[in-house]
Amino acid sequence: MSDSPRTASDYFGAMGFEYDSLIHRSVPCYDAMIEKLINYLPRHPQTVLELGCGSGGLSLPLVRHAPHCEFTFVDASEEMVELTRARTQEHFPETARRATFVTARFEEYSMGRDQFDVVTSSISLHHVEDKGALFRRVREAIKSGGTFRFVDQLSGGTEANHARMWQGMLDFERAPGNCSDAEIQGLLDHAKAHDHHTPLAAHFHLLQEAGFVGIDCVWR
């Protein structure tokens, strides 16, 4: 087994442009998932925080959805933040001038109180071990009437379901044209070292404890 980089940000930051290709080859229905998330966002938010902007896979659709919004994009990897900044500047220069780009871990980033109409994230929150603490801070950061929308990798509610889910992921990654053996091993090493997957029911419980209401899962 190969050594995984010290942090998740090291792992993804080292990929740069290759991350775009890998995420499409390793995550089933990635584009459909992003489209579903966008479809459930408010039409005209004024302030949006994205936790884990990566290379802009969700960031650019967010800006396309609400180009007049003020965005804050946060990621633990400086390389990923700069990649998202460059892509936003290229495709949406006016929005990029209003946007804030932050290199920080979610656990350390100061979100403030009543700052955002929307807090959102794509395939990032499973890197956080204490999700309850993060959810409480997100709840404080959201304005009255605001919303928290995210997509992520979860664990199964039972060991059997979890094993079946991961086997489905591996089958997808091993399909012709998707991931190489080395890429799959790297993903497995990374998951073992850095991921903290949580069942859907536990997410619901932690979100409710944090003060969220109207909690739902609209796609899985």
Named regions from a protein language model:
Residues 123-124:
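Short catalytic micro-motifs in class I SAM-dependent methyltransferases
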Residues 49-51, 55-108:
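Class I SAM-dependent methyltransferase SAM/SAH-binding core
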Residues 1-18:
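N-terminal, positively charged/glycine-rich alpha-helical extensions of SAM-dependent methyltransferases
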Residues 28-45:
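Conserved alpha-helix/loop element of class I SAM-dependent methyltransferases that forms part
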Residues 133-144:
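A short glycine-rich, Lys/Arg-flanked "PGG" loop and its adjoining helix->strand segment in the class I
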Residues 111-118:
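A short acidic, Gly/Pro-enriched loop at the edge of an enzyme's catalytic core
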Residues 151-210:
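C-terminal alpha-helical "lid/dimerization" subdomain adjacent to the S-adenosyl-L-methionine
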Residues 14-28:
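Class I SAM-dependent methyltransferase Rossmann-like catalytic core
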